[in-house]
Amino acid sequence: MPAPAFSGAGGFDSAFFAAYKHVYNQHKIQRLAYRNRPLFAALRKEDMFEGDTYNHSVMFEDPQGGSMTFATAIAQKMSSSQGARFILSRGREYQAISMDVEAIAATRSDKGSLLRKKVTETDRIIEEMSRRIDIAIHGDGTGILASFTTGSSLATTTITLDQPALGLRFSVGMYVQFATNSPTDGTAPTLADNGKFLQVISRNVTAKVTTITLSGQLASIGGLATTNKYFLVRNGCGIGFGTSNPYGGVSGLKSWLPINGPTVGESFWGFDRSVDAQRLAGSRYIAAPGEKFEVTLQNASAELELQNASADVVLLNPVDLNKYSQELGTKVRYMESDPGTTGLKTAGAMIIRGQSGDMKAISDPQVDPGTFYMLDMSTWWLATLNGVPHLDTADGSTARRESTSDGIEIRWRAWYQMVCDAPGRNMVGTFGY
């Protein structure tokens, strides 16, 4: 449906929308989207995801028909390279702004006041969209944000997160559902009480304890029990991903680099990665209990080197990076690092000496505490359809009539999927605390 046109008598016309589009040029969108999101900023974006799916091939083995004996090599000449084909579909994120027509008309002598109001609101929408995209590209595709463990009674509206630092994934006003499991194969989590949700009323987030107060008691969610672990999902996001789920979510770091490795018979975007667990699902390093941070990262780097791979970036939660810095004391070295491809921001990065050279330790709040990723950033990118995020101008305008009220709406959206060209050149690990 075409966007509404306002006559001069109404004091409002298409100039507002032209100005709105001008304000939100690509540079401003990137500046808002990438701020304090090093992984999102660093990922290469390729606007090429046309069609329903994208067939992404990863070559993981060279032809093995050679021999020191001529006759044997000739006999085995039909040996071919080994490749995995992942059939990817897009993940999505949507936001919209509603504008009341009467309020628009009431600003006819000062169109700039309306623009200023909507710019402020749009900035917050882009900020929130980008935060959700950032969470998704770190996640496992299930939509799970964090876990909590119930106490001896469900007659409470307050929960305490198992990992306090993950409290930043929640906001006052958001709606959460409760999952009884946390799948690792891309399937959607099982939601308690047919997906019934509660609203976040307040939160108190610290590095040591995070509590969230909900709009109702846990007892109001059918199927929950005392002293059990459950998982929190943003309403409408517990959809999983995979070839049988064309409207699923995003397979982020946790799914491309599973900490427990691929399972035999799995179907990760239609392929069983267990045929070569390292080259198709990355390397893994599990630190021994009490192992020092420095030792863990050096051992992990050596493990990655065994796979003929090397990383240039190590992503850690700020809590872990702080512990590592304190452990090193005066041995800490820093360098100036630009975590993004756009040059919008430089950040001081600690230097980690790896087996193949220096790696940049980057503080990333969306990495789970206790986990780290050693990444070859040249292997990671986002396959997109238009910008991530972008303004909806599908019908030639930035706005359209609302069907159930006297208003118009402006839509923002993102269509994208995270892609890795060589999982085997990357690693996931855990610290020993």
Predicted segments, located by residue:
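Core alpha/beta structural scaffold of self-assembling particle/tube/pore-forming proteins
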Residues: 1-65, 77-433
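Short, glycine/acidic-enriched capping/hinge loops at junctions between secondary-structure elements
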Residues: 67-69
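Helix-start/capping segments and mature chain N-termini
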Residues: 73-75
